[in-house]
Amino acid sequence: MPHVRRPELITVEASPTEVQEVAQRDLGLTPDADGALTGPLPNWADTGARQRLETRAVDGHATEVALGIENATRVPYFEWFLGPFLRRGARRALRHTAARLEAALEGRPPPPEPRRRTPLLPPVPFAPQAIALLGTVAAIAALANFGGALFGQTADSVTKTFGASNRGLGVALAVSRGGVLISLVAAALADRQGRRRLLLICFAGVCVTNAISAVAPGFIIFTGAQAMTRAFANGAFVVAGIAAVEEAPEGARAYALSMLALAYGAGFAIAVVLLPISDVAPQAWRIAFGISALSIFLLPRLARSLRETGRYIDLTRRTVRRGRGRVREVFARAYGFRFLLLGLAAFLTNFFSAPSAQLTNRFLTDEHGYSNTLIALFRAVTAGIPGLLGIIIAGKLAESRGRRPVAIVGLVVATIFQVMFFLGDGAVLWFAATFAIVAASAAAIVLAAFDTELFPTEVRGTSNALLLVCAVTGSAAGLLVATNLDDVVGGLGPAIAICGVAPLLAAAFVMPWLPEPADRELDDVSPSEV
């Protein structure tokens, strides 16, 4: 997190000695070697940051006080985005400290704590190690999602290159999810080999398989490569979510997942930004896959900045490798019912979300005559700021109101507006898509929180791997149903809309039975069995 370049300056009617005595007594500061006073910054986002107070005598009895922040941790890879929000929050924290100091010197009651926080600041402080890990994990997730989203965005151009029909596209998209067995193995191995190693392997796998896709001579080879891409991308998503939750402080697990979701969105946005390239030439879509492949050159830097999660390190110190990742523990009495509910939720929600996400571009192109450039604009308008808004809302409400209500309301609202989108025309498309992405983003954050929070550390990877199988099975089923019903129901839009029944069933009959993990410590929600 950034240093405050300009200190907060105030002038008080007191001597430097009086100011220092009051600062030590009321602000908890202690003398430093250079004569300044330093100490923790209360209620700030970074536990490693310290406030620094320097005094200088001015006219008569007055003293100029300079308040600043030192040892602030920078957010790797995302300082460019979070920096302005953090600097504003730091400035607000220093002003509050200055107000406390002035009140103490004048004998007044201390001012109330600031009520409003910068929207993207965490609800509780993060340790420097957690900041570094979350930033690096988010960067890997963004790059993996960029690579994994390319097929869905360029599907129309790819199928035209290889002469595939809607049905062929549906089969290819379903087959591309057939690599779930690799995802299953990768995510499960995270319990035995560690989060760090598997996350790096999955990222490298996305790059290599997209390199194959970029030069694929035929649709079969391309589809096979994308099956592997999807497998590695899904594995990266699962392990990234686990790492983010395990390293987050209590009270900020949903916030950590919301920041990870912002990174996913950034990766998806890159895929959308590159979409107009497909209009340049019949096979220009290959350029986007090539760019994804080139991101493998970032692997050494990512490996240097990524460390293992503290919870997993603690687990390895008290268990042997074969005691971790046992499938039978997922289905045991303590966690079996949770897995059944989450597996059903994963299948039902993905039965609709997969065709809704993967076939939207095809729907806009075939049924509404959108060009790739117009689709890119549509995505930017309806998914950019609205998606960010949904993620921020979910991160805050999931901690303050609970996971269950946010998940249920989010699923219902998102499904209703998505169905309106696929059955609508004209301005309805833009209106419905905007509100759908807000609600869908909120629901997705909470569902990811359930998946990671409701299982203990030793099987968190294995349980999420099995849930991924349920999700991918639902995705494949939804894609096949939607692409085979389009001729029967009069178009791709109505066919996808029919699939919207599934998440409504999940919201009504599955989500209410899940335990509520909000306001509870992670180890109390899912105590270890080893």
Residue ranges with predicted function:
Residues 132-164, 353-361, 478:
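Extracytoplasmic
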Residues 151-156, 334-388:
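Extracytoplasmic gate region of multi-pass secondary transporters
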Residues 252-275, 279, 467-479:
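Glycine-rich segments within core transmembrane alpha-helices of 12-TM secondary carriers
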Residues 197-212, 405-419:
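Structural signature of the two symmetry-related core transmembrane helices
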Residues 225-262:
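Cytoplasmic helix-loop-helix junction between adjacent transmembrane helices
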Residues 260-304:
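Helix-loop-helix hairpin linking two adjacent transmembrane segments in secondary transporters
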